[in-house]
Regions:
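Conserved acidic donor-binding segment of nucleotide-sugar-dependent glycosyltransferases
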Residues: 344-351, 359-365
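Donor nucleotide-sugar binding/catalytic pocket of nucleotide-sugar-dependent glycosyltransferases
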Residues: 164-167, 171-218
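N-terminal subdomain of nucleotide-sugar transferases
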Residues: 1-64, 108, 254
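Acceptor-binding helix/loop patch of EC 2.4 sugar-transfer enzymes
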Residues: 8, 75-87, 135-172, 234
Length: 401
């Protein structure tokens, strides 16, 4: 079976949720004997030099990247008002990338073309023109749902109007795209149910993001910093910013009153300026984490206080694989078949979130039990080889690939 992954960001190094999801699936394809080809936009925002990519991966993945600037800009956002297409989508279309795609399709016959995320569906017309491969959307999220959730909390009238317009266009594009797919691969059953409700009748397969759990279990010698809670995520994704703001505004002061020596560490690239300048007691900001394993092992309790978003939080999978006790909202843990109180703590209201964090800070035995439960759950659910093997079987059995 020959698969082409078309990506909106370079997957290596896998240092954020979406690149981890893309890279790990590709690694799983290769391990399962699938001939993999990767064609990706290498964005200005998330630029990753080809020279830093291991030669073995480049060869095995027939890797090719095309540099493009997908940054949001005022002119593009304004000019888009005179278009019928969502700006969220149009900023991922480039003639240069299309030319590279056409050359790839002319040179190689594929069985499956897997679009990594909705935005790459803008290339479906050219795919259909030059290939007979089955077209599959790997839906990392329900994109319009993220923005519909965000709009409920938007206070600026002008911004709400503009984002409302873009969200409506995005939803129209997302639903129109369904008509041109042969299958969908979702990351959660919740997202699968949304596509089914929207009338998609063709095969849908839920394939959670897998990880190499044995690799995550490797420890480093750094001593754990007691009474530390942390949020570690890409801070150029709006729901993550909202999550940190919610925690700081509604939870942190109450936690600190009950556990005065507690420390909150928020980490992640592209930290917004207003969060860099946060002046709260016992709060530390780390903009760039050089060694994720060291960071996870040093800090005790992981927080995922998301109020919006869709899809799966890869950081929760990573956290569980590292054996971290995690406190999350229900939205944050969507798509994971957790058992509340056994392998994660779920809390949605500020008072419940505060209590969950304080209990773990004060009760070492409870924290240790949650750590064991998280790691055991990760070993059972997230093994990458098993995860991707199931998808390969789906492609062969359902799509005759």
């Amino acid at each position: 079976m020959r698969v082409l992954q078309i990506c909106n960001k370079a997957p290596y190094p896998p240092n954020d949720g979406s690149s981890i999801a893309i890279y790990n699936m590709g690694a799983g394809f290769i391990a399962n004997g699938t001939e993999l080809h990767v064609l990706t936009i290498n964005t200005k925002k998330h630029f990753k030099p080809d020279g830093n990519i291991p030669q073995e991966y480049k060869n095995n993945a027939h890797y090719q990247s095309v540099y493009q600037n997908t940054d949001v800009n005022a002119f593009g956002a304004l000019f888009n008002l005179f278009s019928s297409q969502s700006y969220f989508v149009s900023r991922f279309y480039f003639r240069k990338f299309e030319n590279a795609l056409v050359a790839k399709l002319k040179a190689t016959d594929f069985d499956i073309i897997q679009l990594e995320g909705l935005f790459m569906a803008t290339y479906i017309p050219v795919i259909k023109k030059y290939s007979k491969a089955k077209i599959v959307l790997r839906a990392h999220n329900i994109e319009y749902l993220i923005w519909e959730r965000h709009l409920k909390n938007e206070s600026s009238a002008l911004k709400k109007w503009y984002l409302g317009l873009q969200t409506k266009r995005l939803k129209n594009f997302e639903l129109e795209t369904l008509k041109h797919l042969d299958a969908i691969v979702t990351i959660t059953d919740f997202d699968k149910s949304i596509f089914e409700k929207e009338g998609f009748k063709k095969p849908i397969y839920t394939c959670i993001t897998g990880v190499d759990v044995n690799d995550y279990k490797k420890k480093v010698s750094e001593q754990k910093k007691p009474k530390t809670i942390f949020h570690f995520a890409s801070m150029d994704w709006m729901p993550n910013v909202e999550a940190v703001e919610w925690f700081l505004n509604n939870c942190w002061k109450s936690i600190l009153k009950q556990v005065p020596d507690a420390k909150f560490v928020m980490a992640g690239r592209n930290m917004p300026p207003h969060l860099k300048k946060v002046n709260e007691p016992n709060v530390l900001v780390i903009e760039e984490v050089e060694n994720s394993r060291k960071f996870y092992n040093e800090h005790e309790i992981m927080l995922v206080p998301l109020a919006s978003g869709s899809g799966l939080r890869i950081k929760i999978i990573e956290g569980m694989a590292y054996g971290k006790p995690i406190v999350s909202t229900a939205v944050g843990a969507e798509g994971i078949n957790y058992t509340n109180g056994k392998n994660i703590l779920i809390a949605n209201l500020p008072k419940d979130f505060i209590k969950a964090v304080v209990d773990l800070l004060k009760d070492d035995s409870k924290r240790i039990e949650l750590e064991k439960g998280a790691l055991s759950f990760a070993e059972q659910e997230f093994d990458n080889g098993k995860v991707v093997s199931g998808l390969v079987g789906f492609y062969k059995n359902e799509l005759n690939a």
